Amino acid sequence: MHDVIVIGAGPVGLASGIEAKRRGLDSLIIEKGALCNSFIGYPTQMEFFSTPELLEIGGHPFPTRDYKPRREEALDYYRGVATAEDLNLRLYEPVTDLRGQDGAFTVVTDEATYETRKVVVATGFYDVPNRMDVPGEDLDKVRHYFKEPYPYALTDVAVVGGANSAVKAALNCYRHEANVTMVVREPEFGSGVKYWLRPDVENRIEEGAIDAYFNTTVSAIEPDTLHLDTPDGPASIDNDFVLAMTGYKPNY
C-alpha cells in the first residue's frame, strides 16, 4: 500500500509528489496523459502572466530568457524537476475509479488497481470546456482550445468570450490575416484582461480591424454561418471557424 497517490502530473501534482518524497512517504503520481498535460494544449507560443519565481516548485530555480516564461520553457523546467527528483510517475494511465475512505483508498486505472492511505487530486481545471449549449456546437469548425493562429489565416473567425484567452486569440488571428469577430456576453471585456492587452484589442475594434458584438450570445452555429442574439435583435454573420474561449472547469 502506498502512503499517498497523487492524481495529476501538473505543477501542483509534481510539487505534492516532491513534498511527499521528502517526508519519507511512499508516493505515486498517476497522470492520464503527458507530463504537464494541460500545458501541451496551451497556445504554442504562449507567454505566462506569472514571473518565474511564482512557477518554481521544490526549490528548483526556473531560468528563463525573458522576464516571463514561455510554454516550452515551462515544459522543459517541469520535466527537468521531475527527472531530478526521480519521482515515481505513471503517465498515460487514466484513473477510472476512486473509492474508499481516509486511510484506505482504492485507485483504479486502465492498467492497474492501487491501494493508498491518502489521495491528492491535482487534476487542474483545463479538461472540460464550458459549453455554449447551442445547436451546431459539435461541428468540427468549433474549437474550445486555441493552439496557434496559422490555421485561421484568410478565414472568417468568431472568437467567443471576453477574458484574456479570447482577447489573445483574437489579436493573434487578426495579425495573421484572419477576419475576426468577437462575441462577448458582457457589456465590456472582463476586468481581469491584462493592461497590455486591453488597449490593443480596444484600439483594433475602434479602428474597425476587429468586429465586436457586446451583450451578445451565440444562438446557433451552421457550417458557413454564425447566428447571434444581439441587443438589436437576431443577427447572422459569415463564419468559417468558432473559437469558443469560454473557460474551463475541473473534470470531477
Task: State where each predicted segment sits.
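Dinucleotide-binding Rossmann-like beta1-alpha1 core, especially the glycine-rich loop
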Residues: 58, 63-64, 81-85, 91-92
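N-terminal FAD cofactor-binding segment of flavoenzymes
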Residues: 15-27, 31-55
